[in-house]
A protein has these predicted regions:
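N-terminal secretory signal peptides that target proteins for export/translocation
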Residues: 1-6
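Bacterial N-terminal signal peptides
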Residues: 12-22
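Cell-envelope/ECM-targeting effectors and their regulatory/trafficking segments
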Residues: 27-205
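Hydrophobic alpha-helical segments, especially transmembrane helices
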Residues: 8-9, 21, 180
């Protein structure tokens, strides 16, 4: 079954979602079990992530999705299927956003569909260069190829970027203007919200 990348879903989310990757141990008395998380419906994941405080469910979901990403990279023989290297919470946020548009599907279905949708963004070069992108207090580390692709996407939609492959002021300004024009919240970075929006539009340049 196909999954959907919804533009409208982004309007209901903010960067304040409780999506930290945690290293806490799971409580042995939890009603959640790691084996069953993939069978949980997306509505359960989204509900947990929209909580005001970090819960044990959030910890387990985050750890499970982190493990899934590591295993998928290994099984496909690629460096990374997700173009945002750090923080890992961006991967969790990405999956949660996709789940929000596919509430009746299982987490496993959405993860598999997301990996397929991200096929063009996979990094296969073990020595691929990464760049730290900073906007105020916000920062992410991405693969350079991903930044280039997103800069080309911006240029193709009339948001001028001067230096392809560098995160200069023209790039930051273009990301900010693009997000504002499309009602996407968050810093002037190609973060998970930006990526979901781009995927919702189909193929990029």
């Amino acid at each position: 079954m196909p999954i959907y990348f919804s533009k409208k879903i982004l309007l209901g989310f903010t960067t304040g979602l409780c999506l930290q990757i945690c290293t806490l141990s799971a409580n042995a008395n939890s009603t959640f079990t790691v084996r069953s998380l993939g069978l949980q419906k997306c509505e359960q994941l989204v509900g947990a992530m929209q909580g005001e405080t970090e819960s044990q469910a959030v910890v387990l979901y985050s750890q499970w999705m982190a493990g899934y990403l590591t295993a998928k990279n290994a099984s496909l023989g690629v460096l990374d299927v997700f173009p945002i290297r750090d923080p890992l919470g961006e991967w969790v946020r990405f999956v949660t956003l996709v789940c929000a548009g596919n509430m009746n599907k299982t987490l496993a279905e959405v993860l598999e569909g997301s990996v397929s949708a991200l096929a063009d963004y996979r990094e296969t070069d073990a020595s691929a260069e990464t760049l730290e992108l900073v906007d105020g207090e916000h920062k992410i580390r991405v693969y350079k190829n991903y930044l280039i692709r997103m800069q080309q996407h911006l240029n193709g939609r009339g948001f001028k970027v001067d230096s392809i492959g560098r995160f200069d002021e023209s790039t930051k300004r273009a990301f900010l203007e693009y997000k504002k024009s499309n009602n996407i919240v968050g810093p002037a970075l190609p973060d998970s919200l930006f990526l979901v929006f781009v995927l919702s539009q189909g193929k990029t340049q």
